[in-house]
Amino acid sequence: MRILFVTSEAFPLIKTGGLADVSGSLPAALQEIDADIRILIPGYPAVLDKMVNPKFLTTISNLPHVGAINLIIGEMPETKVPVMAIESVDLYQRDGGPYVDSTGRDWEDNPYRFGTPVLMRGKASEVTNKIRNF
């Protein structure tokens, strides 16, 4: 079984609550029962810093409201579950938390920040083979 596990946080890469616990442990458990699983996650600075063996995979261009993004591949610490991080300076390289700014207010562009994996579906033909072979 092939699974693309899309999440906004996964422990130990980044954690704000219980979602990160599930998103960090469930892929590892599925991998243990021979699922071919990869995590797709926003490329927050903490994620990019904590990924094991991060490498550039590809650039996806012309995403609506987003422009271009880079896919960075690597692994989860300890479990070695494959990870793809969506790298975008405009979307994810910010002070504050993943969901809110340093004053606690939601980022105004959160729908685009967390909708980017959905926007990528229109570009699937550009990246399918690269993702499949990662």
Q: Where are the predicted features?
A:
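N-terminal subdomain of nucleotide-sugar transferases
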Residues: 1-75
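Alpha/beta-hydrolase fold nucleophile elbow
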Residues: 132-134
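A conserved catalytic-core segment of Leloir-type glycosyltransferases
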Residues: 43-129
